[in-house]
């Protein structure tokens, strides 16, 4: 079996996004590399190297294999 990890992004990093992040981290084939949420005032990186953005356009510039959309239903 391949050791390749799928690079994952999360759009919407509130309660649901953070919960999804926890579940994704528990899977050996996936790795969260970037997240975005309007609550972030600027772009940067967390201590573990995961990048964060305040807008989804920057997130989409990442070379992702999958994107989890964790936005409220009304959006």
Question: Language-model segments: what does each one mean?
Answer:
Residues 1-47:
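N-terminal Rossmann-like dinucleotide-binding module
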Residues 50-75:
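Beta-loop-alpha module in the N-terminal Rossmann-like domain of NAD(P)-dependent dehydrogenases
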């Amino acid at each position: 079996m391949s050791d390749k990890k799928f690079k994952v992004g999360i759009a919407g990093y509130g309660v649901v996004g953070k919960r999804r992040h926890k579940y994704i981290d528990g899977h050996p084939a996936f790795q969260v590399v970037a997240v975005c949420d309007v609550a972030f005032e600027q772009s940067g990186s967390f201590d573990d190297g995961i990048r964060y953005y305040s807008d989804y356009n920057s997130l989409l510039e990442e070379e992702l294999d999958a994107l989890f959309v964790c936005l409220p239903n009304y959006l």
